[in-house]
Amino acid sequence: ATREVKDDIAETLRLQDPEIVITGFDRPNLYYRVETTRRKDAFVADYVRSHPGESGIIYCATRKNVDKLQELLTEYGFAATKYHAGLSAEARRKNQNDFIYDTAPVIVATNAFGMGIDKSNVRFVLHYNMPQSMENYYQEAGRAGRDGLPSQCVLLFSAQDVIINKFLLDKKDFAEMDDEEADLLRQRDLQRLQTMERYCQTTECLRNYILAYFGEHPTAPCGNCGSCNNDFDEVDMTDAAKWMINCVAELHGRYGKAILFGTLQGANRARLR
């Protein structure tokens, strides 16, 4: 937990000068990776296909995505089940047991799944959507590799994830709080979301990024994450760069960034015609 969370726990439990024992946040057997893609369904299907028989959790932000992705994997012939709060208690219990006992090695779920689940041989955790906070991501990704064997934690990122999460944050109910307290919590949630967005976009060591967030400061890159191993898509941007430079030159410095960006994006607005 971060210092803020530890302080909240102590305050809630009314602890006076508690002794705090921290075991460390590093999980060396976990390989962290961010994949920026709009073709998430295809990526997930290819990933599961390339890891036959392995146990994995795929987290989605919404029940709708859980239902859609589980149905897609089933159509492709994968033994995949699902879990979210919209299912009956009986269905949740059955699907959870199918996953635990490897009847269905893959489970697609919202963050309602995982608390109290003790399954050591989870080889991968995929996040179909970016979580709202590093705390959530660390906890959910950490369900991989509890047996100490190498396991992968892959986060699929697109700009749409930020929009979805902001929408979900806007729906949070602060009715029982006064306006000042509610505003503080909204700002906190937004800052946490921005931290996750930076994680998805950084080229720095992903493990060190996570550890630094939780107050640890490694002195060297881990050598075992997507950033350290250069798991990036290389795209030749030469033509695009020339196009942008020509566009700037054609505008002769007479217009601001809004007009420039609109022109580059091909926006159909009156001022650009």
What are these regions (language model features)?
Residues 1-180, 191, 215-218, 227:
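Helicase motor core with emphasis on the C-terminal RecA-like subdomain
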Residues 64, 159, 210, 266-267:
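Short glycine-enriched loops at secondary-structure junctions
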Residues 22, 122, 202, 236, ...:
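Short, surface-exposed helix-loop/turn micro-motifs enriched in polar/charged residues
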Residues 43, 195, 243-246:
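Pre-recognition alpha-helix immediately N-terminal to the DNA-recognition helix
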